[in-house]
Structure formats: structure tokens, C-alpha cells
Curated annotation (Swiss-Prot):
Places the protein is found: Mitochondrion outer membrane
Top-rank taxon: Eukaryota
UniProt entry tagged with the keyword Membrane: yes
Entry protein name: Mitochondrial distribution and morphology protein 34
UniProt topology in membrane: Multi-pass membrane protein
SMP-LTD domain location: 1-195
Range of residues in the leader sequence: none
Basic residues composition-biased segments: 360-372
GO biological process terms held by the UniProt record: mitochondrial genome maintenance; mitochondrion-endoplasmic reticulum membrane tethering; phospholipid transport
Length: 622
């Protein structure tokens, strides 16, 4: 099958060449150019020649009146030519030095600046050979796709043909650009040209887009600043009259740009005075700009938020003043009661109570809170009442501390809450309680020191929070023995054991102010032997200066369970001592001298059984 190409109509149409030159120019400048080319590449001449290409049909996929699809083998060796015009850099050394450090450049240079030379290149003797896929449709135009690189050879003629290395360089670069042109850009160019020829809708759409891209010039635009505002003012803020505006406009039109509206100036001044933020409660400090961020008071708002008096927030000044006054009173009360029994939860409680009234809202918009004060502290009326009521002096407080906490809101708490009220300042004189007098009276009736039986060491309630230490028991026994030496009569009669009443329920505390370390209770800690009696005598000599009020200090500093256990231990010890004393008198009724010796040397069944053990308790091992 043969084809007849009507090549002459393409050459006769002048508009076709013009559109083809524009498309080729855009395609050549689309890809990045080498650094030696410093100007755009412009297609000045285009001629397809008189010899058409040769096509060999390999396959026809679709054939109809308005569409065609086929695969061809194309070969072209005609007289078509193409002329390009651009500018090149005549100093390649300068182009090379632009990408290098100045320290590495040779000095001096023969030509430190580049010389731009116009270049004209003509491409001729183009030979093409390749496989082409051709698709034709009246609605979609012509689509040409090359399956391989069709460019075989071409001739490049330029103004630098007399310089061999420049000629070879241009030949190599232009061939590379043309290969990209045939594979990527030429099919798109042919498709757009075919749409212009057969598709009227595409031509109208392209014309409309060109008008939008390049709008026609309707004359110079109007300057809105040349029109004076309604209430003009000068640079100093003074209102200008109509005559002053007319005089300014007659002199020169430049002065009109310095006129501003009075409303705009006032708004700008208000914005400047507000320190560039929207917060209405910022401190008025000159030359300081505050941002409208969330302050510390808003971030720490809630039951767990504690505000430090050393870092007050900047958002609300009136709230900050109230917070500072309360914080100062709280600091004074804490300083006066540095040795009081304040635990960690109670400290957080007092801080939360003070921060309740310092919220985000001002006092003007806040509701009045009920100042309900739950006072759990007991104050002694006189010395006689203190002697009759046990444990009452533990919660005596100063008047200043009460005044501080009465001004803050204290929420109601359950009785099981381990939070304690603020402690009292240190006291120098402490009155003996009822428990102290009972223990002193029971200890005065004993003739010799008895050890604590081992079976009592395990009689500990399971619900106790803190265990009594061996040092507390030793200290109690040492104080009792010292009182027994002072108050021991010649012939004392045995008294029936008396169980002291328990103290009223006090509020438990998590911490204890005992100066002795907490030790794990063991049976051996409560047993006494020959070695333990010597060590207890040494402790007695060292602790004789302690007052009798320290006997029940560990019990009073603990909770209800600790006090009950200590009272039970004291009553059991007193009862056992009385039983042993009565048993020793009955067994040794033959002579009074032997009875005295037994009372002084032996301690009954418990101490005789404990004397057999010579192993020291684990608490005294080294």
C-alpha cells in the first residue's frame, strides 16, 4: 500500500510555520540549559523542505472514515533546516570559577568577567529513522509516538566553526537536546497543531485563556491614596481643614500621601497602648510587650494546682495581690511552727485552701463563698483540766495560726482522712498525762527490772500502720526503773492491776516525730537476758535525764491503734510484774532475808527461763 503526501500545502501556509516556531521555542527553553548558554534559545527560521518522509506500514489496528491507528517505519533524509539564535559565554574559565571557592582561583586572570557573544546555529541534513505509532482522529487530532530514538545524524553550523573544540562542544550539546525533543516534546507539539487545525472548540478555548493571561491595558490605575480621607490629620495627629488640604494639593500631590484618617490613627494608637495583645489585665510596664498566653494561674487552676508565691502570674493583677497576702500569712505561720507535726498531705491541703480564692475570675464577678471553719483543735482551759484530760495538750495551737486559717476556705473532710491540721509551735513545758501517772505508779511498785516476755512481742494487731520500736520499749522501761528508784518504799504492798482508760480518738497522721529509727519488731527484741539487762542499765544511765512525759510519746505521736497497743502493753507488763511478785513472796515465805534476796536477784518464772538464753537479740548484734 502506498501513500501520497501533499507536502506543498504545509509549505504554503505561513501561519503554520509561525505557530510551529513558537512551540519549538517554548520546547527548547523548557529543559535546563548548560551554563555556557546565558540567553534564551529562539527559533528564527523553520523549513520542512520539499522531500516528504518515507513511511512503511507495519500494522494497522483501526481504520475508519474519521479515525486511523497504525504502526509505521519512518525514514527521512530531506532538505529541511532549522535556525536558532542565542547568546553564549565567551569565557568558560569564568563559568568554571563561579562554582569554586575564590581562594582556589588563579590570580590574576586574563579575563575576570565573562564576554557575552551572540550565537546563531543552523541545523541541516537531518536524518531520521525509527518506528512511529500514528493515531488520527478528527475529534482528538493526531498523536505521534516514537518507540525508539529516531535521530541518526545532523549538521550543526554556527559562528564558532573556526574553533574546533567549540564546534564539537555545540554539536554534542545540540544533538542531546534534539533527542530529548523528538522523544518528549515533538509528539506534544504535533498534537496541539492538529487540534488547532481540526478542533474549533480547542482554538476558541485557547484564545480565551490567552486573553485572561494577557489582559489588555486600559490605562494607568488610580492611586487610592491620592483621594483625601473624610477626616484627615497630619503626621502629628492634628486635624486639617479644607483650606489646608487645598493648599497642600495645590503645592504638590506628594503631600497627600502623608494624610491619614483620624479614626485609623486612634485605632492604631489604641492597639499600640494595649501592648500588642488582647489581654485586658496586663501590667503597665514601659517598653515591654506581653503576649496573650495562658498564665500560671490559669494553667494551675484546679484542686491539684499549687501557685507559688515567688512566681505570681501576670494575667490578673488584683488576684495576684490577694494571693500574695495570704501566702505571706501562711509563710509566717509555717515559720513559727517549724517543729510542729505537719505532714506532706497537710502541706498540700493548706496550699490548696489558699489558692481557692485566687482563681481566674476577678472578685467583682465572683460569688461570695461561705467561710466555714472546721476547727478540730482542742485548747486547754487551765492546768487542772490538762491534768484530767489525756492527750489534750497535743493539739494546742497559737492564736496567730488560728487567725490565718480562719480566713481561708477549708473543705470538710472525713475522719479517716490522714490529713492533719497545722501543728503548734514548740512547747517548753509539758504536763504529765494520766497515762504517765499510771505507768509511774505501776513502775514504783516493782522491786527489780523485769524483761518483757517473748510471747508479747507477737501480740501486735494486724491493722497497725507503724510498729513500735525496741528503743521505745527500752526507753519506757528505763524511765520506769528510774522512777522506781526514786519512789521505792521499804515495804510496799502490792496493788491490784489497773487498766488505764484509752485516750480519745485522735486524728491519725502518716508521719511520726520519733527521733529513733523504725526497727522491725522481733521476739528477741522484747526478751531480756543477762546481757540485755546490762545494756538496759547502760541505757538507763544515759537516759535518766529524760522527763517522765516521754514514756507515752510514741503512742501519742501515732494513731489510735498505736495508742491502744501501747496501753495494752503497759497494763500487761504491770499485771505480770504483780503476779510474779506475789508468786515470789508465797514461794519464799520461810525467811524475810531470803525473800529480799530473791526479790533483788531473781525475777520469778519468766526471768529464770530467760536467763538460760545467752544469745543476744538480733538488734544488738554487730
Amino acid at each position: 500500500m502506498a501513500f501520497n503526501f501533499n507536502w506543498s500545502p504545509l509549505m504554503a501556509d505561513a501561519g503554520f510555520y509561525t505557530r510551529a516556531q513558537e512551540l519549538l521555542t517554548a520546547a527548547l527553553n523548557k529543559s535546563p540549559k548548560p551554563p555556557i548558554i546565558v540567553d534564551d534559545i529562539v527559533v528564527t527560521e523553520l523549513n520542512l523542505g520539499s522531500n516528504p518522509p518515507e513511511l512503511e506500514i507495519l500494522e494497522i489496528g483501526d481504520l475508519a472514515e474519521d479515525r486511523f491507528r497504525g504502526i509505521f517505519k519512518m525514514s527521512y533524509a530531506g532538505d529541511a533546516f532549522l535556525t536558532l539564535k542565542t547568546c553564549v559565554q565567551a569565557n568558560p574559565l569564568n563559568t568554571y570559577l563561579l562554582t569554586r571557592h575564590p581562594f582556589a582561583s588563579p590570580q590574576p586572570l586574563a579575563a575576570a568577567t565573562g564576554l557575552t557573544i551572540p550565537l546563531q546555529i543552523t541545523l541541516s541534513d537531518i536524518k531520521l529513522s525509527g518506528f512511529v505509532i500514528l493515531v488520527f482522529s478528527k475529534q482528538k487530532g493526531i498523536t505521534v509516538v516514537f518507540r525508539n530514538d529516531p535521530l541518526e545524524s545532523l549538521k550543526v553550523s554556527s559562528t564558532f566553526d573556526s574553533i574546533p573544540f567549540v564546534r564539537d562542544y555545540l554539536q554534542k550539546e545540540i544533538e542531546g537536546q534534539l533527542r530529548i525533543l523528538f522523544m518528549d516534546e515533538l509528539p506534544a507539539i504535533i498534537h496541539r497543531l492538529s487540534l488547532r487545525l481540526w478542533g474549533t472548540e480547542y482554538s476558541e478555548l485557547e484564545t480565551t485563556s490567552a486573553q485572561v493571561t494577557n489582559p489588555p491595558l486600559e490605562g494607568p490605575g488610580l492611586d487610592p491614596l491620592l483621594n483625601p480621607p473624610e477626616d484627615p490629620v497630619d503626621a502629628s495627629g492634628n486635624v486639617l481643614s479644607t483650606s489646608e488640604i487645598a493648599s497642600l494639593s495645590l503645592d504638590s500631590g506628594v503631600e497627600m500621601h502623608s494624610l491619614f484618617s483620624r479614626k485609623n490613627v486612634l485605632r492604631l494608637a489604641a492597639l499600640t497602648d494595649s501592648q500588642r495583645t488582647l489581654s485586658l489585665f496586663t501590667p503597665s510596664i514601659q517598653e515591654v510587650v506581653f503576649r496573650a498566653w495562658t498564665g500560671l494561674m490559669e494553667q494551675a487552676d484546679g484542686p491539684s494546682g499549687l501557685v507559688s508565691p515567688m512566681s505570681p502570674p501576670l494575667s490578673r493583677t488584683h488576684s495576684h495581690v490577694a494571693t500574695s497576702s495570704l501566702s505571706l500569712q501562711d509563710a509566717a505561720s509555717l515559720a513559727s511552727s517549724s517543729h510542729s507535726r505537719l505532714s506532706l498531705p497537710s502541706t498540700g491541703f493548706s496550699g490548696y485552701g489558699l489558692s481557692m480564692g485566687a482563681g481566674r475570675h476577678s472578685k467583682a464577678h465572683a460569688r461570695k463563698r461561705k467561710k466555714r471553719v472546721v476547727d478540730l483543735r482542742r485548747r486547754p482551759k487551765n492546768t487542772d483540766d490538762m491534768e484530767s484530760v489525756s492527750g489534750e495538750s497535743e493539739f494546742t495551737e497559737s492564736t496567730s495560726a488560728a487567725s490565718v486559717f480562719s480566713g481561708s476556705t477549708i473543705p470538710e473532710e472525713n475522719n479517716d482522712d490522714p490529713v492533719t491540721p497545722p501543728g503548734s509551735p514548740p512547747r517548753t513545758i509539758r504536763q504529765p498525762t494520766l497515762c504517765d501517772r499510771i505507768v509511774a505508779r505501776n513502775g514504783a511498785e516493782r522491786n527489780a527490772r523485769r524483761g518483757i516476755p517473748a510471747e508479747f512481742g507477737h501480740d501486735i494487731p494486724a491493722s497497725r500502720t507503724t510498729l513500735p520500736t525496741a528503743n521505745d520499749i527500752a526507753r519506757m522501761l528505763a524511765t520506769t526503773s528510774s522512777l522506781q528508784q526514786q519512789l521505792h518504799p521499804a515495804n510496799s504492798k502490792s496493788l491490784p492491776p489497773q487498766v488505764p482508760p484509752q485516750e480519745p480518738a485522735l486524728r491519725p497522721s502518716l508521719t511520726s516525730n520519733s527521733p529513733y529509727p523504725i526497727e522491725k519488731p522481733n521476739a528477741s527484741n522484747y526478751t531480756s537476758s543477762g546481757d540485755s539487762q546490762q545494756q538496759q542499765q547502760q541505757q538507763q544511765q544515759h537516759q535518766t535525764h529524760l522527763p517522765s512525759s516521754l514514756i507515752m510519746e510514741a503512742a501519742q505521736s501515732g494513731g489510735i491503734l498505736e495508742q491502744a497497743w501501747m496501753m495494752k502493753m503497759a497494763s500487761e507488763i504491770a499485771r505480770r510484774i504483780q503476779d510474779e511478785k506475789m508468786g515470789g513472796e508465797d514461794a519464799a515465805g520461810s525467811s524475810n532475808n531470803k525473800n529480799d534476796n530473791k526479790n533483788n536477784n531473781t525475777g520469778g518464772f519468766w526471768e529464770q527461763s530467760l536467763m538460760r538464753s545467752h544469745t543476744p537479740p538480733p538488734a544488738y548484734r554487730h
